[in-house]
């Protein structure tokens, strides 16, 4: 079991398999990477994943950049050890093309970033992306069983803060008898230069909390899922949130193969050249030293 000095058990691993992306979203935090080096190899991804699995990690999430830009991604997924869940975060542009193959290789489900259904607004946010490709990708993911699809909507003040109802209606259109899609509403981390887009999503959450017919509190950051007549919706508030940090159960691996204990900190731990027991010891020690960014 991987546990830090605050009693937080690491059960989830996020591996950024590439720094490359086919969109240019103006707010992107690049998984906390500032100057990534050489891209991690497929063999090293599998080796690190196996080390974490042997130390008790149960779930793996593949991130980027845009993971679908790696041509060897199907082989990577095929060679991963067996986790309770292997999921992937994607912008969805290439998802329609690869969804079925990735499902056959062992991918469990996907998170798809979609901040708006408005074509012009989407093009502006993403630096030229086509929203219909994302919609097609979500439809394909639901069709082949990469479910539940979580649609990640980052709320941007003055841009899309009035579009939650529309995105939830779109999300719920896939739920015919069972939950195939969930809307995940995310509060912006106001990194320098983006403060003007920050929007406190508490008021939106209060609205859906009032109409919820059922609630489920997830272990991940103690987040609440609301089951409403309009669909299933969840809220992610990372800023100034001690509960978010005190229930953090994840570790990150950067696209150049370093350990990153916290998204909001610049610290990375080099594990180059470490294998077997030496790699395991490095992981254990890195986890042990983790600290919450926001403390009570």
Swiss-Prot record:
Keywords in alphabetical order: 4Fe-4S, GTP-binding, Iron, Iron-sulfur, Lyase, Metal-binding, Molybdenum cofactor biosynthesis, Nucleotide-binding, S-adenosyl-L-methionine
Annotated positions binding [4Fe-4S] cluster 1: 21, 25, 28
What name does the UniProt record give this protein? Probable GTP 3',8-cyclase
Q: How is the cofactor bound?
A: Binds 2 [4Fe-4S] clusters. Binds 1 [4Fe-4S] cluster coordinated with 3 cysteines and an exchangeable S-adenosyl-L-methionine and 1 [4Fe-4S] cluster coordinated with 3 cysteines and the GTP-derived substrate.
Q: Does the keyword Metal-binding apply?
A: yes
Q: Which reaction does it catalyse?
A: GTP + AH2 + S-adenosyl-L-methionine = (8S)-3',8-cyclo-7,8-dihydroguanosine 5'-triphosphate + 5'-deoxyadenosine + L-methionine + A + H(+)
Q: What is its EC number?
A: 4.1.99.22
Q: Extract the Gene3D superfamilies matched here.
A: Aldolase class I
Q: In which pathway does it act?
A: Cofactor biosynthesis; molybdopterin biosynthesis
Q: Where does S-adenosyl-L-methionine bind?
A: 27, 65, 113
Biological function? Catalyzes the cyclization of GTP to (8S)-3',8-cyclo-7,8-dihydroguanosine 5'-triphosphate.
Q: Where is the Radical SAM core domain?
A: 5-230
Question: Where does this protein hold GTP?
Answer: 14, 61, 89, 150, 250-252
Q: Which family does this protein fall into?
A: Belongs to the radical SAM superfamily. MoaA family.
The positions annotated for binding [4Fe-4S] cluster 2 are 245, 248, 262
Q: Tell me yes or no: is Lyase among this UniProt entry's keywords.
A: yes
Q: Quick one: signal sequence residues?
A: none
| InterPro entries, sorted | Aldolase_TIM (IPR013785), Elp3/MiaA/NifB-like_rSAM (IPR006638), MoaA_arc (IPR013485), MoaA_NifB_PqqE_Fe-S-bd_CS (IPR000385), MoaA_twitch (IPR010505), MoCo_biosynth_MoaA/MoaC (IPR050105), rSAM (IPR007197)
Please provide, alphabetically and separated by semicolons, the GO molecular function terms listed in this UniProt record: 4 iron, 4 sulfur cluster binding; cyclic pyranopterin monophosphate synthase activity; GTP 3',8'-cyclase activity; GTP binding; metal ion binding; S-adenosyl-L-methionine binding
- Give the GO biological process terms: Mo-molybdopterin cofactor biosynthetic process
- Organism superkingdom: Archaea
Q: Which SUPFAM superfamilies match?
A: Radical SAM enzymes
């Amino acid at each position: 079991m991987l546990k830090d000095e605050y009693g937080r058990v690491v059960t989830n691993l996020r591996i950024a398999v590439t720094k490359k992306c086919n969109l240019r979203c103006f707010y992107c935090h690049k998984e906390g990477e500032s100057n990534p080096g050489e891209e991690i190899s497929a063999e090293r991804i599998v080796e690190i994943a196996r080390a974490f699995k042997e130390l008790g990690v149960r779930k793996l999430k593949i991130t980027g950049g845009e993971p679908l830009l790696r041509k060897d991604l199907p082989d990577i997924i095929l060679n991963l050890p067996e986790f309770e869940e292997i999921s992937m975060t994607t912008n969805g542009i290439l998802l329609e093309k690869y969804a079925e193959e990735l499902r056959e290789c062992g991918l469990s489900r996907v998170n798809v970033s979609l901040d708006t259904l408005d074509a012009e607004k989407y093009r502006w946010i993403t630096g030229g992306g086509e929203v219909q490709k994302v919609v097609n990708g979500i439809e394909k993911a639901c069709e082949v069983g990469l479910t539940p699809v979580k649609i990640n909507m980052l709320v941007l003040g003055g841009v899309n803060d009035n579009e939650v109802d529309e995105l939830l209606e779109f999300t719920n259109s896939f739920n015919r008898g069972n939950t195939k899609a969930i809307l995940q509403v995310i509060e912006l981390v106001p990194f320098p230069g983006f403060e003007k887009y920050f929007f406190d999503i508490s008021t939106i959450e209060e609205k859906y909390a009032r109409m919820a017919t059922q609630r489920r509190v997830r272990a991940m950051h103690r987040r609440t899922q609301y089951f409403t007549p309009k669909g299933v919706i969840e809220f992610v508030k990372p800023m100034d949130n001690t509960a978010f940090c005190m229930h953090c159960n994840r570790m990150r691996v950067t696209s150049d193969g370093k350990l990153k204990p916290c998204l909001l900190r610049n610290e990375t731990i080099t594990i180059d050249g470490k294998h077997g027991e030496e790699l395991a010891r490095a992981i254990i020690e890195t986890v042990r030293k983790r600290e919450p960014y926001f403390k009570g």
